[in-house]
């Protein structure tokens, strides 16, 4: 498992200094940065391409640059939320999952299982409530 780490300097030469890396292989890297960068927006930063405008301050990117599918954007969101399971991340993930379930795929993932429990009205520690998700998702 790749752990999100705050890199000081150029720990990976593909990304700007100070980036947070969420996932990487030899061929691709998923990261967030405040710096301007020539990379493909992904995860929560690409939700606006699918009709969802988030208010998250971080910007998420993937290299190499390429056209991403909805499934790839959703998978990158899951990777970000795995490493930073904040309520805002989980709320936006739930909204995207509800709106685009058939197109994004219902990938079996522990986070999706918990989101599905929330959508059934269950209380899941650390996750938004059903009302919170529905309130923002309207």
Provide a role label for each language-model segment.
Residues 55-138:
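Hydrophobic alpha-helical interaction segments
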Residues 1-2:
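Basic, Lys/Arg-rich alpha-helical nucleic-acid-recognition elements, primarily the DNA-binding modules
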